[in-house]
Structure formats: C-alpha cells, structure tokens
Amino acid sequence: MSHPKLESSSNKEIITEEVGLLKQLLDEATQKLIGSESFDKIEKIVSLSLTDDYTGLKETISALSNEEMVIVSRYFSILPLLINISEDVDLAYEINYKNNLNQDYLGKLSTTIDVVAGHENAKDILEHVNVVPVLTAHPTQVQRKTVLELTSKIHDLLRKYRDVKAGIVNQEKWYADLRRYIGIIMQTDTIREKKLKVKNEITNVMEYYNRSLIKAVTKLTAEYKALAAKKGIHLENPKPLTMGMWIGGDRDGNPFVTAETLRLSAMVQSEVIINHYIEQLNELYRNMSLSINLTEVSPELVTLANQSQDNSVYRENEPYRKAFNFIQDKLVQTLLNLKVGSSPKEKFVSRQESSDIVGRYIKSHIAQVASDIQTEELPAYATAEEFKQDLLLVKQSLVQYGQDSLVDGELACLIQAVDIFGFYLATIDMRQDSSINEACVAELLKSANIVDDYSSLSEEEKCQLLLKELTEDPRTLSSTHAPKSELLQKELAIFQTARELKDQLGEDIINQHIISHTESVSDMFELAIMLKEVGLIDANQARIQIVPLFETIEDLDNSRDIMTQYLHYELVKKWIATNNNYQEIMLGYSDSNKDGGYLSSGWTLYKAQNELTKIGEENGIKITFFHGRGGTVGRGGGPSYEAITSQPFGSIKDRIRLTEQGEIIENKYGNQDAAYYNLEMLISASIDRMVTRMITNPNEIDNFRETMDGIVSESNAVYRNLVFDNPYFYDYFFEASPIKEVSSLNIGSRPAARKTITEISGLRAIPWVFSWSQNRIMFPGWYGVGSAFKHFIEQDEANLAKLQTMYQKWPFFNSLLSNVDMVLSKSNMNIALQYAQLAGSKEVRDVFNIILNEWQLTKDMILAIEQHDNLLEENPMLHASLDYRLPYFNVLNYVQIELIKRLRSNQLDEDYEKLIHITINGIATGLRNSG
C-alpha cells in the first residue's frame, strides 16, 4: 500500500520562523545570564558551526576556560531541544491539516480500514487486531522529568504561533510567556544529580499516561470503531491498542527491582487510571444536569441515583447527577481500598499522608468526598466490569428515552476507557535471566532432596525431571521451614506478589514472564517450576504466559529447534490453550546486533520469524512476536510503519507487541497529537502487513532470501573480524568513545553492565549503542554492510541490478537499506576522527581507519543500490531537519572531546565533570534516537 509521506509543513517557511524565534529567545536569556562580552564567544561558535569551519571551531573551544565551558555546554544542549519542540508542533499541525482536508498520509487509519473492508475476513481482522506498545525504562531517556514538563509548556505555547500571527492570540502576552519558560529552562539543571530509582522511573512514565496516552488510546479506539461502522462493519469489543509496561517487573540485570517495586508499579498504575475515571465523572456530573421534570429516566437509573449520599435539595430532581455522584463515591472508595486502613476516614487520611509517589495522582476531589462521608461502610467496586455496568445502566436510560446524543462524548469515552484499561492501566511484564531461574530451581530441588546438583544434568535429564514435578506432584518444592538463599527468597516473593496482584486487580495486570537468554526447553520449564511454587501454573493451566526471549545470533538460529521440542509436550499445549491458543515469543534486536552486526541481526530475526510462524501453524498455535526494539537502528529502531510492514508476511496474525524505550517515549508520546499519530501508525502498519502480500511470486521471494543468506554470511564475518578478533578494538571503543562517562550518567536504575566489563560481550547493548551515537560513528547501524554488498557484486556484475530490484520490490530489504541510509546521514567521520585521537596508542587509533574505509564503502554501496546521488533523497523531511540541527549539536561533540581530554589528563575539576554529561544529554537530544 502506497501513502504520501508527511511533509515538514503545509507552510514550508513556518518551521524556520519558529526555530529562529526560539533561538532568539534563548540568545536573550543566555546574554542576560552571562553578559554581552561572554555571549560574543557563543555567537562566534555559532558562526563557525554554520560555516562548517571545524578547524576554527576546535581551536575556539580548546581556548575556553572550564567556567566558559559551562554556559557553552548548556546553550548548545538546550538549542536542539527547542528545535525538537518546533518540529513536533509542526508535525502535529500537518497531521491535523491533512485530516481536516481528508488528505491521505502514511499510516492514516481511515485509509487502512477502507482497504481492509474489502477483505473477506474484514470483521474478524478488525475485531481481533491488537497492538501493544510496551514502555520500558532502559537507560536512554536522558531528560529530567522537570525539563520534560518545561518543554511541554513551551510546546503548548508554540502551538499557538499561527494564531498569534493571525492576530487571534494576544502577541505580547504569548511572547512574554514563551520568553519566561525559555529563561527558566536555561537556568534549570538538565541532568540528574542522582541516579534514578525504580520508583522514579515508574512515576516518570506515568506522566505520559496523564499527559497523552490515556486520552489518545481512548480516542483512537473510538475512531477505529467508528471508521469500521462506516464501512458496515460493526465491532463488538475491539482492542486495537492496549498498553504494556516493564518498569517494576523487569529485574533482568537490575537488582533494584523487587516484589515491592512490582506492587508499587501496579498500585500507581491503578491509581492513575482510577483518578482519570474520577476526573471524567466530575465532567459528567457537571454537564449532565437533566431534570426529572423535563425528561424520563429508567427505574434502574432511579435506583442507582437513590443510593447517592448527595442529599442537596438542589439536586433532588437531577437523577443523572446523583447517579454519577454515587458511581464516583464508589470509585473513590475502590481507590482507597488499595491502601491499608481500617475505617473509611482513616483510609482517606492515609491516602493524603502517603508518599509523594502515590499522592501526586490523587486530586482534591478525594479530600472533598472524605469530608462529606457520614457512614462507616462505603461500597466499592470489586472489578472494573462492575464499574462499567453502572455506566452502561446510565447509557441505557439515556438511549431508552431518546437522549442518544448525550451518550456520545464524555460518557462514551469513559466506557471505552474502562474497556481498554480496566483498573490496571497497562499490563506489567516480568522478566528475569534464565541463569537466575536455573539457580533458584537447583536450590529448590536440592532442598527437597530430589537432586543435589541439578545444573550438572544433561538437557534431556533436566526436562524429564522438571516435567515430572510439573505433572505428577501438585505439591510445592519449597517449605516454610527450610532455609532459603537471599536470591530464592527474593524471586519467590516477586512471584507471590504477582499472584496477589492478579487476584486483586484482575488477570491482565500481569500476563507474561519473559526469560532472557533462552537457550533450551529446560529454561522454560524452570520458570514453570517457579510459577508453580506460588500457584500461578499447574498441570492444566497457566495464569502467566511463559515467553522465551531469543537474543543472540546463535539463540535465534536455534529457536526453531527449541520451540519445536517445547510445543511437542502436551502439558505445554494445555498451558497455551488457557491463553486463547497464543504463544508469545520475544525477539532481541540489541544483543543480536552486537553479536553479529546490523545485516546479520536483521536477517537472522527475519528468518527466525518465518520459521517460528511455520512451527505454530504446524501445531495449530498462533505464534505472536514481541519485538524488543530500541530507539536506534542498531537496536531495531527506525521508522515504525516501515519496520512493521517489512516483517515476514504471515508473522503478524492479529497481535504484535513492541518495546518503546528511552527518549523514543518522549518523541512519540510527549503530547497528545504525537501520541495519536504514532499509535495510529502502529495500528495501520500492523493491519497493512496482515492483509497485504507485497511480493506475490513465491519463486522471487525464495530467490531474494537465498541471495540474503550469502550476503549476510560475509557481513557477519567482516563485523566479527573487527569487533571480536581485532586485538585493539576493545581499547579503541573504551578510549575513543565516552563509554566510561555514559556508564556514570544518571539515566536509569539499571547498571550499564551485568558484571565487570572485561570484554565487549559483557557490555549491555544499550550503553554500547549509546556510546557509538555519541562519537558519531553510529557503528552498530551499518558496519559490515558495505563489504558484504561489494563482495556479492564482485562475484557477478549482474548482481548490482539484482540488489536494485530487491530494494525496489522487497519491503524488508528496502527498510533495511533505508535505515542504513538514515544512520549514515547522522554519522560524521570528521568528528569521529577527533574522538579517535583520544586513544592512547597508534595501533588503537588505527582502528578508526578500518572503520572509516568501511563507512565510505557502505555509503557507496547504499547509494548504488538505491540509485541515488545523495543520502536521504527519499526522506526530505529528515534531510531538512538535519540541515538546521546538525551544526548546533556538532558543536557539542567538540566540546565533549575537549572536556574528555581535560578529564583524562586531570585538568578538569570534579565540579566540572558533569559538563560531559550535559554534552551527552545534548547530543542525544539532537539525534533523537540515541540508544
């Protein structure tokens, strides 16, 4: 399906005006802080950057004192942030503009539904499609929450710029407000003084739900149903979008995730969504002032209204208001019942005195209701379904007496939200490394006198033993009297908490447990043993789905055999049957890329999906994929629409899950317009891939796949030859990148490595990619690509034409190359050379020459296959964006290099070390997808 891509703006000059205005105000704020003489140096640096005089730039920055570095770092870190805001505002305007004129754009939902409506299974497809963005707290989100709140205010003001130009909004006041917030942000710390805790990550992510996601998901779902209805397809209870969450449940490599953080995550989520419902009920209460003297109501509505404690004479004839009052009181009590307390009033008090993590979400309405309570026993909702039934009772009364139009709007949105979010908001995933599960199971088996050294058993022996425990003995292995290691106690506690939360908030609060580094069937049975210990799994059913994560090249290659064996067991089939016949498999993009390079990773993942989909079909099971993507191309990132539509045909049955990480969350969901558009695109792309076969000739696709096998083999060899076989590469990475400084940056609760780093394989994929972004090589997104294509073309001169055909006709290959094109455009080998000079020895510095040669070769090969003269020819919007943003954050690289030099030569006092973190922050902001 072909769609026009969104342009920068219907008015091409407006974004230039906005950026100019924001820069002017930043200049004013900076000059006010430091004076005209010092600001002259910033103006000189700006001039040098805009004329690409990098020799002069390097000399000027080297001459700056440490004190002068402070303001230069801050200025050039904030400027890209303001440019981002302008772009976001402009994109939102363009989306609304095209929607208002009924124009098409990439990912437009109405266009997708128009197409799918002609499909023979249209209703089934639209009823069951489910896209699940899963928000994670991987350490790539470098912005402080305070800064995000300030940028949100600037964003809201900039949205009014066109109205200011048209004279609709008072220019003087608007300008003063914008000046004030830019002045504040210039004087606000943009980096964290202390490392985030898990509880901070939880509350930070909740801000996106409050700010944009709840309303965007609800609105989009309602629009989805309405568009289908226009095509004569009446959907019963579609959930095209539901949300997922890793924060609080992902303990792989993060010792700070515990049973307490899991409970906190669930409780805060519940409070956020229930508070949203309370706010919506407030709106309904204010607006639904229908008098019984002027309209009829159903007997059921009267019964509901009469239970209200609102005895005001002014509302005795307003049954709808009284009904909403009663519903609201029950909902408030439901919220309070989540906290421990004896009497209703004590619960309110504990609510008000609770920690700021929870208290920030409780609105003043609760205190008001608390002061009016007269009874000791207040009703509460046991389930979200009970709450929904009361709302439907109101709806039915309105419809019964001809008030259909009043159902639309707030009431319909509220009912829709309850359907989507329940009382839990987002499903929390649990995740742990397979080695931890094995250690816990080994301890349990030894404690129960079953086997002394479980880990020494063969894979076959392990499976036989675990299968026997899972099918033949309903008793648990653990005993309350038996001593347990700290690790086992911690793991059992988090599983027990998961069960309690499912009992309290509903099954959907926790549905999956992911096993990192899944390498065998026994890895999955070991998790089952742990789940059995707390009653979450037995011989007939599983209340939590076991999700293997295949992440290295080797594990992905072995995934077919592992899953074939796993699905062979009748026990496993019973578990899957209780999950509506779905078996989820998570695919790791980050580790596979670090393991084998971009081409090898991408192709191995593609083949694995094909093979695993076939296994599912052979067993009558729906295999669904969870894509563990990051922000960068090196971690599976890139444009969302193309990423989804380039998946193998048939790999998306009706459900797809994908991680949204770090700064990508802010970029995609920082405001309601952006959230709506990006979520709309995810749904459209998933449906498009489900119904549209891009290549209809099976022989052609087989030929393309055979070609890729040969190309990837060469790419993998070239990549591993440098990364794992070159004796100087390790030192080059650690000396010619800011990896040490990135690892100390307070950007997440998770450590940068699972253990002390002595080799590349021990480093987490995220700081690995983040550091290559900082030194502007973007290594994980392209290295090995050029050599592989050159080798293939040298075998036969006709092979270039073959690659060009693959690029034109095969979405997977097109997306692969387009991502490399984008990454190359953001790299800068002149800057990378300056980082290389940081390395101590000539042998280590010479690694850069190997990288540079491959970079040039990759660029030449990509342009030849795309048949383009320049990079980004098919992405003019990004090209324009980089044109006006690159000069500014290129400055930050030179500042960072100089600061690292001073730090490593002991010329930078401890007080100034955080300047390096400011530059890291600014470069990540400018790139927009840093990790």
From Swiss-Prot:
Its EC number is 4.1.1.31. Pfam families: PEPcase. Its cofactor is Mg(2+). The active site is at residues 138, 594. Transmembrane segments: none annotated. One of its GO terms (cellular component) is cytosol. It comes from the Bacteria. One of its GO terms (biological process) is oxaloacetate metabolic process. InterPro entries: PEP_COase, PEP_COase_bac/pln-type, PEP_COase_Lys_AS, PEPCASE_His_AS, Pyrv/PenolPyrv_kinase-like_dom. GO terms for molecular function: magnesium ion binding; phosphoenolpyruvate carboxylase activity. It catalyses: oxaloacetate + phosphate = phosphoenolpyruvate + hydrogencarbonate. The keyword Lyase applies. Keywords: Carbon dioxide fixation, Lyase, Magnesium. Gene3D superfamilies: Phosphoenolpyruvate/pyruvate domain. Forms oxaloacetate, a four-carbon dicarboxylic acid source for the tricarboxylic acid cycle. NCBIfam families: PRK00009.1. Belongs to the PEPCase type 1 family. This is Phosphoenolpyruvate carboxylase. The gene is ppc.
